Amino acid sequence: MLKLIMSNFWKNEVPKGYYDTSILFDKKSKRNIQSNWHKKTFSAVNSYIKDDDIVLDFACGSGTFLGKYVKNSNSIGVDISKNQINYASEKYGNFGSFFYLENFSFEEYENHFDKITCLGLFEFITTDEAEDYLEKFKYCLKEDGRLILTTPNFVILMNIIEFILSKFGKLNYSNQYKVKYNSNFLNSTIKKNGLFVCKIEKIISSFIFLSLLIGKTALKLDKIYGKLFNNKFGLIILAEIKK
């Protein structure tokens, strides 16, 4: 397997527990853009997962998805950052097992997982690395299992948003991107590795940014927009993939 090469940004510069503490569940959270963005993504991904599914959450960060959404405590989270894995183990250790990437062996999990989730990773790794991990995911999935993958939909609007976030966001990701996918490019990458795309949908509209001003109403507008256009337009690509 190729050794995953990622910058020091992911290992040490992202604060411990950053993504988990950015996701809020109180009344004020309806007006928090970042929190709403992540919760909409997690909810969309979780709609593909059954309560008894054993899940591998690859690039799990600080463990929020397993800790807040996945029901089966036999699930596993893996990440390249020791800081995030330590945080996840401390906070969500009762909801799953968490491993630093160098301590996780794919070979021990042949045909093991009902679902594998990989959320927001592929844009930060090379296509060679992506293809290598797709092969590993295929090995670890049960015969009827599914890989659920998300990545930004890098069309004009998303590129503009990323530019703005690089200037005004809490973290600047602009130097971390290695590949910018659209749905066609992602589809071809997946098929190239002997996997099959069951479904591609695009989630999260620009209405999400209005949540700062109109809170819950913005989330309703985002939901209506998705239904109206059957999730054919959105800032995030969500792919359901099988062997």
Task: Place the predicted regions along the sequence by residue.
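Short amphipathic alpha-helical segments at helix-loop
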Residues: 26, 118, 167-171
